Amino acid sequence: MVARSKGYRSKTRKLLEKKVREKGAIPKLSLLMHDYSQGEYVVVKINPSIHKGMPHRRYHGKVGLVVGKRGKAYEVKVNIGDKERVLIVRPEHLIPFNGIQKR
């Protein structure tokens, strides 16, 4: 028997799936051009068609705080359990958070 591969995108068959009408489309320019400022809340929403600057699947759907900018990417602080992680994510995988964030 051959050992099962455990790659970076393993177990993402349904998680990184696009709807039929979204396939082949590039993200909205308004989302790509959006300039996030420090202290702004964002949602990590992975775009599976763009591999560059993609975070791990563990962080998909998490709400984080923009800490800074590194090149074209943003540093986003996300809480996983009782630990804080700082992710380096490109804007293709971020959307603005419009809800209420409780701390």
From Swiss-Prot:
Disulfide bonds: none annotated. InterPro entries: Ribosomal_eL21, Ribosomal_eL21_arc, Ribosomal_eL21_CS, Ribosomal_eL21_sf, Translation_prot_SH3-like_sf. The keyword Ribonucleoprotein applies. Transmembrane segments: none annotated. One of its GO terms (cellular component) is ribonucleoprotein complex. One of its GO terms (biological process) is translation. It comes from the Archaea. The keyword Ribonucleoprotein applies. PANTHER family: 60S RIBOSOMAL PROTEIN L21. Belongs to the eukaryotic ribosomal protein eL21 family. This is Large ribosomal subunit protein eL21.
